[in-house]
Amino acid sequence: MKRILFILLTCIMCVPLFAQKGQAELAVYGGKLSFTKIDNPYFGSFDPGFGFGFQAKYFLTNRMYWAADLYGGTDDGTTYYEETAIGRTILSAYRQDYSISTGIGFNFVSLKHFNSYIQGLVGIGTVDGYTSNYISETVGFRRDDLKRTSYLVTAGAGLDFAISKHWKIGGAYTFRYLGSVDGSHAIVAKISYVIH
């Protein structure tokens, strides 16, 4: 098994390099977004939503690139039920996430019409929203603002398919860790314009 794995890795590393040093790519992407609580920074949880972003890549070598990313996402409104002393009540929550990040990526498979990459970015992100919480029968409900800014660390992997000399389509998965808030997972489709 180790021998087969070694042969596969050797083949991948020996694949001809088709991305050119100095080449740039501009991409727009969007897709499904879900949130994961890391600690317990707020009451309740958020429903899945959608995210949208722009990314620029500049190839430093034939495989390694520098990337800059602008991103925005939302839960598209969350409602949930809670059993309380006054009966079943509906609580609501809402959030919008924004971030800017930069980092390095690597095309580990690079063919003429296909490439697969991994990337890691760091930056700053902010959350703007609120959560609702039932306190007691006498107090009732409380709306807690969720406005936080924190460092951001992202890791992602994706695939790109060249459909012409200047255009690529593809998909990607990204995990974003927003330090003092939570994490999010995104599966997106994207389209890229290649500048030679």
Where are these regions (language model features)?
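Flexible, solvent-exposed loop segments that connect beta-strands
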Residues: 35-45, 71-98, 126-151
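Transmembrane beta-strands of outer-membrane beta-barrel pores
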Residues: 30-36, 70-76, 122-128, 175-179, ...
